Amino acid sequence: MASEENVPFDPTSFEHIPVLLNECLEGLAIDPAGTYLDGTAGGAGHSRQIALRLDAAKGGRLISLDQDPDAVQTARARLAGLPATVVQINFRYAGQALEELGIDKINGALLDLGVSSHQLDDAARGFSYRADAPLDMRMSQQGETAADLVNTLSREDLARILRDYGEEPFAWQIAGKIEEARENAPIETTLQLADIVASAMPPAERRKNKNPSRRTFQALRIAVNHELDALEEGLDTIFEHLAPGGRLCVITFHWLEDRLVKNKFRRWATACTCPPEFPVCVCGGKAKAKLITRKPIEANTQELEENRRSRSAHLRVLEKC
């Protein structure tokens, strides 16, 4: 019998319900003759609906990116026959991908920053604290794993990651328990880590919190994949390649992402760059963009009922001047 590692990936198994789909399509204001970028293909839910609205005869084209090889296989299968090109690369390098394809400007771009249902539900990927699996958490399946971090970082560095990326109030205690546990044996699986996290919590907190490991797993995932650095760089390079009048839609799922996107959008949409203590503007600056959404768009009642993972989704839309 073939080992589980040798079983070829089946693209039809990659399930991902696109969040805020109609709102994204409206936000992009798709021109059938335009060139669009989906920086996070995932299960190609958003990508397919964008591509279906493009007219190849008029030059319409979609570039769909993902760093996850499973997502790339899925996107290629589901976008077959449509005016779409799929590239395996992190969206932080979107500019490089576009330039290699001979594309200077795009008419719109979408980033869906959520972990896909497939990644969460596939225990072997190590994202979930609900099933035992190797402690991995890598989107690209390359580089350091979560196990590498928990077994090598100092207590101080682990606590900082848990505090900064997970808002974990018991970060220091959890980091201490991790340090103690790895002295006896390496921490290699998700349930090992989940048990260690639970042991660091006061009994009252364990009773109150059904998922005491959630914040720790989020923090480690962000650290393993350098998610905030990738987002910062990706937003900059995508905005640089956006044509005047082009739209940028970003879906976030936690406050760290949303704050970064909100602040970036506000800076681009602000004309004056003078220091705040200046009584009047002397820079003569012009806004680089305008906000299409002053406040983030959230899932409606129907979508919340159909897809519980949409409950924390926030969509922000920007148009380049």
Task: For every predicted segment, state its role.
Residues 1-321:
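S-adenosyl-L-methionine-dependent methyltransferase catalytic core, i.e., the SAM/SAH-binding region
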